[in-house]
């Protein structure tokens, strides 16, 4: 399975226009997704940021005819946004812990987050997360987190995580202390747009909202 991500910044006051225009092309768009074998497609919004995620069986799944449709839709929707990631190009994968991916999503909740990197901190962010991958020694994570990936473009970081609610539990004191230590250390290289660590910092950020989803 191949994973893909993209991101845009909404122009001031244009989020409603973006939603309305997306609704007008939604049926045609999902038909192209289905024909191209693209699944688990979703777009998320926090503040003026749009983050999209989807999956396919291979990297090159959209033929030239369908790609032309996407370019035309991009022009139609693009009155409302500017690209953060490079259009139609892979976004940089900063971290992954795919674990055991649940094919059945009925008991999945999502954690999707957005942060802004301190200028010049992208490689340090990658280094810290590479260390987490190495520490797993190839062990497959059973859950509750699954299909977890973190991406970066334009100085932003975007996280996508599928959480198996049947395996969730209250944090132990050790887990809580470890999480607080990690997140406080990360604050020296990034700031949050979503509300994931408000319980640690005492700040108040917006909760991310799913704009659309296609299975």
Q: Locations of the language-model features?
A:
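Short glycine-/aliphatic-rich beta-strand segments at the starts of folded cytosolic domains
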Residues: 2-17, 108-123
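C-terminal edge-of-domain segments
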Residues: 97-106, 204-215
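An amphipathic, aromatic/His-enriched active-site/gating alpha helix that lines ligand/cofactor pockets
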Residues: 32-39, 56-90, 143, 163-206
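Short, structured motif recognition centered on aromatic/hydrophobic residues
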Residues: 5, 26, 112-114, 157-160
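Surface-exposed beta-loop interaction hotspot
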Residues: 92-116
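Short amphipathic alpha-helical segments
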Residues: 14-38, 121-145
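Hydrophobic pocket/interface hotspot
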Residues: 22, 52, 113, 125, ...
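Short, glycine- and small/hydrophobic-rich beta-strand elements in well-ordered beta-sheets
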Residues: 30-51, 55-59, 137-166
